[in-house]
Amino acid sequence: MPRRSTYHHGDLKATLVTTALDVIAEQGVGALSVAEVARRAGVSSAAPYRHFASRKDLLIACAITAAHRLTGELRAAHAGAADPGDPVETLAAAAAVYTRFAAEHGSGFDLIYAEELRDAGSQELLDAGRGVMDVLLPAALAVTGEDAKSALQLLERQIAAAHGYAALLRSDFLARRHATVEDVASGAAAIARSLANDARRAEQAD
């Protein structure tokens, strides 16, 4: 019996990216293979290579898509923060969004800034990654008195906490207390709020 395709003619490229992101969500970035994506999409193993010359090219497309999705969710979170005018609350809302995103999609900055993509030479990927930081950085700068180094350090700590929460949830480490995505998102937001308040106090003390 011939294999039935899961895509409509003309949108194979988008289908492959969506399918690849599903694989990443289930198994992680390292598990992604072109062959598995083709199998799930219901096409021949050669079909993806009409759009992506290699696994790396497919991964780049996934990273760009993930960055755009995350940027959109972060923008929405900023607008819906408890106090949109307070950069501390903006950062807390962003941490919650990032945690949900990483928990539900199986990746976050580890895909967008994957080591194997650092020398990819994709301007579109660089722009997509900058787009995420462009959403996060203004609030961090406001908290740290426009000190770029301190702002980046603050974001690094907040993202590390958020990503760590998501990873612990996905690994079932938190299963014994029946933690949910919302539980870890709230935890990440609390840490982000604490770190931002500490940074604000340090800036005001100078």
Placement of each model-derived feature along the sequence:
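Amphipathic alpha-helical packing segments from all-alpha helical-bundle domains
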Residues: Y113, A120-G145, L152-E156, E182-R193
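Helix-turn-helix
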Residues: T15, T19, V23-D57
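Generic hydrophobic, amphipathic alpha-helix propensity
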Residues: L12-L21, V37, C62-A66, L70, ...
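Amphipathic alpha-helical segments used for helix-helix packing
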Residues: A103-A120, A167-A175
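Amphipathic C-terminal alpha-helical segment
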Residues: I159-R177, R193-E203
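Amphipathic alpha-helical linker/stalk segments
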Residues: I64-L91, Q123, D127, G131, ...
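N-terminal intrinsically disordered/low-complexity leader segments
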Residues: M1-D11, R200-D206
